[in-house]
Design a protein with these regions (language model features):
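Sec-dependent N-terminal signal peptides
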Residues: 4-13
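CBM-like carbohydrate-recognition segments
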Residues: 22-79, 83-162, 221, 327, ...
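Well-ordered alpha-helical scaffold segments within catalytic/enzyme domains
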Residues: 23, 74-99, 166-181, 228-264, ...
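Residue-level detector of functionally pivotal "anchor" positions at catalytic/ligand-binding pockets or at interdomain
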Residues: 474-500
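C-terminal tail/sorting-segment detector
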Residues: 512-523
Length: 523
């Protein structure tokens, strides 16, 4: 006898729903793999030791442009992490997919992270409270040699804090997937680097001005240089608590008299405190209470200011203007994801209120109804042409935050509605506009006259499909019910392709099989 999960189609509604979710999860994951593989083929060049992503490719030819910046390259790492997480989550439902792809993507992930070294540079940064040499900082453009990234070019503007934040997030995910402590250690270094960009000068009330500038060469403080680090900070808190809860860190800051001082802090608590502090700062300064979405930035004068001389020279505070700029989906998405993590760790119900608020107003504020083929779709922001704008990835950041929020206790119904609309739009584009296994940025409108695309857009779509697979898998787990099925030699068993399977109760493959008109899930 073999234990299985047995679904009597059209007979047991709860189990039928579970199989529906499982089928959708596998379909989403399969499409993620298809798009990611096509993107790696068309948008990447070079050898394993000198591997790079091109900026633009063409679905109708082999034409490509030069190397991409570190931001799109990081999105390719993200896509691999998302697919690997989905493969692990669906290992029992889709063992063939797991066996075929898991080791391949682990190997490819290692290659991608190793070749980050072409963006890496080092320099001595004079910040608000410290003067320190950082050996692992990633430049915007790719260098021709490892470790020669131009992190000081254009008056420090060729490295920005948000790039380090996105990388820290994906390196933590890579560490969780592989156990490679090098990834964890780099993520910690990058996190400490961006925290060093926190404006710790105090105002006339003794309060920190707070906020992290866009980069060490900027005075403006952006949603994208604050919100993205909240989730990684909470993750690092979890990791340090689990691995070395007594780990200490020397933190430099400015005291009530604006003098530089330091204190020894527990590293795990330090990360959680900063996650809460950055979240509170961004909500106070960039939240639009009218739209319930987040502004882009606080502007400021371009000229950096310093105090002191020689070894005592430090960066000075520069006043910022009021909130301004377009409300982009990703800037609200990072706050939604941050609220989910902070609710999980702190239990503070104020974060739950924020989750519900953002889940609702992202749906009503960023998506709009579109009639197409007699049906109503919800269209999320897109760009006029594939070579202008980044809305495909911005939407991806918001969508993955909805996946996070959907797993929180008593999730908002807007989470499911939003995720359903993302999935529906991707499927529409896949069914109507797929070219060379790639999708147009206008999922509902198609390619038009364009055949060019960016790998950045395509890895975003792959990430979305992979995270949707995880969302569907969770829904299946909530719906599945278990019964026992007795193996009989006289029964014919088939895989989902209709191919007959040979074997005994002990040798039938794990995963979804079909027997006597019933779908079986073999554990």
């Amino acid at each position: 006898m073999i234990k299985v999960i047995l679904t009597l189609l059209l007979a047991v509604a709860r189990s039928a729903a579970a199989w529906s979710q499982s089928s959708k999860a596998i379909n989403d994951l399969s499409k993620a793999i298809e798009i990611l593989d096509a993107t790696m083929e068309r948008s990447f060049r070079g050898s394993n030791t000198n591997y790079y992503m091109v900026d633009v490719c063409d679905v109708a030819s082999d034409a490509v442009s030069g190397p991409s910046d570190v931001w799109p390259y990081t999105a390719a790492i993200e896509a691999h992490c998302s697919v690997l997480e989905a493969l692990s989550a669906l290992k029992e439902e889709a063992p063939d997919l797991y066996d075929l792809h898991h080791e391949h993507y682990l190997h490819q992930l290692d290659i991608l992270i190793d070749n980050l070294d072409y963006y890496r540079g080092s320099y001595t940064l004079v910040s608000y409270a410290t003067r320190k040499t950082w050996n692992t900082v990633y430049a915007v453009p790719r260098a021709n040699q490892r470790g020669r990234g131009d992190v000081t070019g254009d008056n420090l503007k060729k490295n920005v804090y948000d790039d380090q934040m996105w990388l820290a997030r994906e390196l933590i995910r890579a560490y969780r997937l592989t156990g490679n402590t090098t990834y964890r250690d780099i993520a910690i270094d990058l996190t400490n680097y961006v925290i060093d960009g926190w404006d710790c000068w105090r105002d006339s009330n003794g309060e920190e001005y707070g906020g992290i500038t866009w980069g060490p060469g900027y005075n403006s403080k952006h949603a994208c240089s604050n919100g993205p680090i909240i989730q990684p900070l909470v993750w690092l808190h979890d990791i340090v608590m689990a691995e070395d809860s007594d780990a200490m860190y020397t933190y430099f800051y400015r005291d009530d008299d604006n003098q530089v001082t330091s204190k020894a802090v527990k590293l795990a608590e330090h990360y959680l405190d900063f996650a809460k502090k950055i979240y509170a700062w961004q909500k106070k300064h960039l939240y639009n209470s009218q739209t319930h979405l987040y502004y882009d930035m606080l502007g400021a004068d371009y000229a950096l200011q310093y105090v002191g001389t020689g070894a005592a020279r430090r960066r000075a505070h520069v006043d910022n203007g009021g909130p301004t700029g377009t409300a982009y989906p990703y800037n609200t998405g990072t706050m939604l994801a941050g609220a989910v993590e902070l609710l999980r760790v702190t239990g503070d119900e104020r974060y739950r209120d924020d989750i519900d608020d953002l889940a609702r107003y992202c749906y009503t504020g960023f998506s709009r109804p579109v009639r197409l083929d007699g049906m109503t779709y919800r269209q999320w922001p897109t760009d006029a042409t594939p070579l202008q704008g980044f809305n495909a990835w911005f939407d991806n950041v918001l969508m993955r935050a909805y996946v996070d929020a959907s797993a929180s206790p008593a999730p908002s119904p807007y989470c499911g509605q939003s995720l359903q609309s993302f999935e529906t739009n991707l499927n529409y584009a896949y069914d109507h506009y797929l070219k060379s296994h790639m999708l147009p940025i206008d999922l509902l409108g198609g390619w038009g006259d364009n055949t060019k695309t960016k790998g950045f857009h395509q890895v975003s779509f792959a990430s979305e499909y992979a995270m949707l697979a995880i969302w569907r898998h969770r829904q299946q787990a909530d719906a599945v019910s278990e019964v026992r099925h007795e193996y009989r030699p006289s029964t014919h068993y088939y895989n989902l392709l209709g191919q007959p399977l040979q074997g005994t109760a002990g040798t039938l493959p794990h995963g979804i099989l079909v027997a006597s008109g019933h779908k079986l899930f073999v554990k």
